[in-house]
Amino acid sequence: RQIERTIEKLPNDKSMIGFIGGPWTLVSYAMGKNKKNGTDKLSKFEWNIINDKLIPLLKQNVSMQLEAGAEIVMIFDSAANQLNEIDFEKYMRIVFKEIVSNFEKKVGYYAKDGVNYSSIEMIKTELSVPLAGLGIDSNESLTDFFNPSRKGFIQGNFDEKIMIQPPEIMKENLDKFIEKISSVSIEERVGWVCGLGHGVLKTTPEENVKFFVKKIRESFV
């Protein structure tokens, strides 16, 4: 009902984006591992939770959000960087096959902090996954992901930590961000959804948020 109520209040030209937590991120938080640095090899117990418990529930949740009117649903997998490379690739195949492939171009994926985006793109291509798009965190060079042959949107990736800085510092960095994005042709950046590398931090000045939105619209619309 919350999605339906929100849509009722949105103008017709605004979209509703739903979200779910990534399976491993949910396990990581539930087991108190979310603050852990470094990579992990998943135990049989953890794989069983992901495959037998979480995947079916998350698939059902995505379906419910789309039926309620969400245009797309993002998978936020902020702890995926904890997985070692072998487990990460195995994990991504499960997420793509069991969740994303059931909802053609209706599910996007976001991970952060050193996650291997090249592996994500490789697996997406290998499995012909109909991914709606990919969120990129602010540690990456966003222009590396612009390609006219790319399928799906690219979302990101101004540094959310800069947003909490004094306005003059934030504005200076935003100008540099805009200059770099503007160096890429319009054809290459088709499908770019401008945003932050992660969410808005709670200490972000409202003035900075308003300026960011205004400046981006003036620069690219």
Task: Give names to the regions the model predicted.
Residues V100-V221:
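Catalytic-face loop-and-helix region of soluble metabolic enzyme cores
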Residues F19-T39, A68-Y91:
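Active-site-proximal loop/short-helix segments
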Residues R1-M64:
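Active-site-proximal, glycine-rich beta->alpha crossover segments in alpha/beta enzymes
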Residues T6, L58, Q65, M92, ...:
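Conserved, mostly hydrophobic/aromatic
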Residues D40-W47, V73-E85, D159, C194-L201:
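Active-site-proximal beta-alpha loop/turn segments in soluble metabolic enzymes
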Residues L42-K53, L57, L83-V95, Q165-N173, ...:
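Alpha-helix N-cap and loop-to-helix initiation/capping positions
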Residues M16-F19, L66-D77, K106-K112, G191-G195:
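Short beta-strand segments at enzyme active-site cores
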Residues R1-E4, L83-F96, S138-G152:
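Active-site-adjacent beta->alpha loops and helix N-cap segments on the catalytic face
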